[in-house]
């Protein structure tokens, strides 16, 4: 079976290679990152251009309430029709950086201060998002999510998070590593799989039980 290789840049700036069987295309690719400092924490989602419009049309219907620039990039604030939630999204050259608020749209100065506290570098392979020096924020978690048509999805955590996810017992061998079956919390009879490779790990959800052969051909590798 032919393989397809994804060369990605994570929110932290780390480089990730994911090798997948080439029989089905990747249908979506997104990332997430969370920052915290003291009692404060905030999370962001990163998707391709059009991510904001898709979310506000199909996920949680919302209308734009404000637009302004932060460090030369446009930020769009949208409020859900029921006013129970709102989103603010920074539009990059290749990607969009979104955060979600509870309740009505926040004031523009609050949103501007949040995005202004970040150093953002947008590459074709991914958006790098880091707290600016002096903010006292640190990156606590990051992940990259990949969906493959008719096969399933992978969630790849950052290397530091991955260490805590590896079971202590040996798993079943795959081409590049080993795999463990894990019961999905709160979903009787539903399972995910932890795929461990020499330089990375992924949580895999299969579209059907016949996807085990597909899973066995996946490799995940973070690079220094």
What residue ranges belong to the model's regions?
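Intrinsically disordered, low-complexity prosegments and terminal tails associated
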Residues: 1-224
């Amino acid at each position: 079976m032919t393989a397809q290789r994804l060369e990605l840049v994570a929110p932290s700036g780390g480089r990730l290679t994911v090798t997948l069987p080439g029989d089905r295309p990747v249908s979506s690719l997104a990332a997430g990152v969370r920052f915290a400092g003291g009692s404060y924490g905030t999370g962001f989602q990163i998707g391709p251009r059009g991510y904001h419009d898709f979310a506000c049309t199909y996920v949680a219907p919302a209308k734009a309430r404000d637009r302004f620039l932060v460090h030369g990039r446009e930020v769009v604030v949208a409020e859900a029709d029921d006013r129970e939630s709102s989103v603010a999204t920074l539009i990059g050259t290749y990607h969009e950086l979104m955060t979600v608020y509870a309740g009505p749209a926040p004031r523009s100065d609050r949103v501007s201060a949040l995005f202004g506290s970040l150093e953002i570098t947008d590459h074709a392979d991914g958006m790098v998002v880091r707290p600016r020096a002096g903010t006292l924020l640190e990156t606590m978690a990051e992940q990259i999510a990949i969906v493959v048509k008719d096969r399933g999805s992978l969630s790849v955590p950052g290397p530091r998070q991955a260490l805590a996810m590896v079971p202590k017992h040996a798993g079943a061998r795959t081409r590049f590593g080993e795999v463990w079956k894990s019961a999905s919390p709160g979903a009787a009879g539903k399972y995910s799989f932890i795929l461990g490779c020499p330089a990375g790990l992924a949580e895999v959800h299969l579209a059907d039980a016949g996807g085990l052969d597909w899973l066995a051909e996946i490799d995940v590798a973070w690079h220094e």
